[in-house]
Amino acid sequence: MPRATLWQRLTGAGFARFQAGDLIGVLPQGSAVPRLYSLASGRRDGFVEIVVRKHPGGLASGQLTALEPGARVTAFLRRNPGCHADRGRTPLILIGAGTGIGPLAGFIRGNARHRPVHLFFGMRHADSDFFYGEEMPGWQAEGRLTRLVTAVSRGARRSYPPHWRI
């Protein structure tokens, strides 16, 4: 992504057009094969955000999780219209697990119109896999997230998606 001024970052100007759910193709060093990740942010956020699970021996995930602030990667954006929340007012039910929370978090963050959004999120371990867990109470207080239901498959209090009530 090209460098953007502070004003461009605050207003979302100076970035290519993209939204949560679009894809970013990352070309890891040592490979010509891009790895596609769903974006957890939109242009108006002023940053590009993805959720990455580090795979043991994984080339791209290993490089991405080792990045320091200000580091650069070779990447491209690809629209993914099949993974966009429409602009309607009908309630939105989001279901995801693990790193699949990325675009869903982007939809919630971008819900400035306070559309009813219900998130059902599954994870293995609540202490390490509850991505965006610190932000969710704020999203609920702001009216961006109506309901949060979680399932944790490992640990002391296990629960599984079949036990969810929608």
Residue spans for each PLM region:
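FNR-like FAD-binding dehydrogenase module
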Residues: 1-166
